[in-house]
């Protein structure tokens, strides 16, 4: 009898921990927002562009151009005095409850980032209990945020997925950008020892044709989206300048976020005579103090594979490989040093030079932190030293030209 009573009590108690359905949400009641674009009008109002997934049109998978002639997403543009007002006004256009739990991309207008900064936008997003701060953050470069969220893409059905995948692939293979999310930016701004840097994204082509399904069905799309440079902000969250092409890859080297990229080196009169595919790398920022003033020693260790050769090298000769390694070292040091000069010229430390000094010399940092960017950074001695090791020369030693010459 006692056992039966205990069993009954346990069964009753178990009911307490069982999940209920009081807060259930039907898919047909939700407008799943995959991306948010934020622009400003000429009269200083905000315009939100909400990229909403059409579930029935992506049921066949996430790759391909869409379900027939039906777009996989719909984009609603709402204007308001602030972001909160614009979101409330969305109820006049969208028949379902806005659902931000799956938002994986936020795009901010370049002009807005320059004139107003990030504080107000980030504050609005971070306050929403449903919004994920792991959403990727990009700046619309030379275009409106509207175009980044509206353009339909031929390979990935959901445009926000295309942006995320491109950033992943570019960061992993090309080294020209770094993928940043909202949380990364919030942490950087809160730390106040370095400034945030955010990847740029641009639209190439005809924006009017890019929003039609024809853009996904053409072999040569009339509009495409492309990762484009790094936007450098100050510690207050205002966009100050851009790093593009070699400048951006130099910054990624300094941030120690290179996964794979390539290094080209000239040989005599032959431009880009040899190309090294980087397979492993490690960048260390070593702070030192000299006569009470800081300086930074940048150590870059690189391993890679010979990827392309234009000059008839004798690659089976260790002395030739050693000479090529020196040429690659020189080129990499030049590339990084060029970026360092631009960083010092613009007086914004987004790499974290100051942070390394703070960690090793906290007492000295207290005296420098208030004037670090304006006084110390422009005069900071930064020595760059690269050490490259050629792991392999590919599937062949000598170039084909060299082989034909020997024959």
Curated annotation (Swiss-Prot):
Q: Which GO terms describe its cellular component?
A: plasma membrane
Q: Which GO terms describe its biological process?
A: spore germination
Q: How does it sit in the membrane?
A: Lipid-anchor
Cellular localization per UniProt: Cell membrane
User: Keywords for this entry?
Assistant: Cell membrane, Germination, Lipoprotein, Membrane, Palmitate, Signal
The signal peptide, as residue positions, is: 1-20
For this protein, the record's NCBIfam families field holds: spore_ger_x_C
Q: Which family does it belong to?
A: Belongs to the GerABKC lipoprotein family.
Query: What does the function comment of this entry state?
Result: Involved in the germination response to the combination of glucose, fructose, L-asparagine, and KCl.
What protein name does the entry list?
Spore germination protein KC
The organism of origin for this protein: Bacillus subtilis (strain 168)
Q: Which gene encodes it?
A: gerKC
